[in-house]
Amino acid sequence: EYCNSFLSFCPTVAVILNVEEDHLDFFRDLADIQHSFRRFAELVPPAGPVIVNADNAGAMEAVAGLEPPIFTFGLDHTADCTAANLTEVDGRPVFDVMIRGEKYARVELHVYGHHNVLNALAAASAAWALGLPGHAVETGLASFTGAGRRFEHKGTYHGAEVYDDYA
């Protein structure tokens, strides 16, 4: 979204993870950021969904009253796509992806953190919106091991675990 680069896309589905005060060297304030995300969501054709994090007030405010179908995901609020039976195995999230109260997929992530559960729910929401079966989501998310330099385990040094996380 930096410098409004995402406004040059032609999305058939839009996913908005969060809208917060970021890149303030370019954007004036949160309202300016929300305006850009709304413009991005408006690029989606009428039949295409706009998938939004219901747990992020900035994202929800950005799409309030928008015409394309809004499909929500989240953990802390009632949303179209949620996680049920959330547990951890070796510190990594395992949960059922629920779409409007129905189990869609059972997900075992290989990345850590609450934010990655939300990212997985966003990906599952997009997959569902595009008509993909739940087993494709299970396979795809199980194979994801993270983005480079985002909490990337590099090894052990004198008994201490070493991670690279540029953000």
PLM feature segments, named:
Residues 1-2, 162-167:
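Switch II (G3) loop of P-loop NTPases
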Residues 7-162:
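Acidic, Mg2+-coordinating active-site environments of NTP-dependent enzymes
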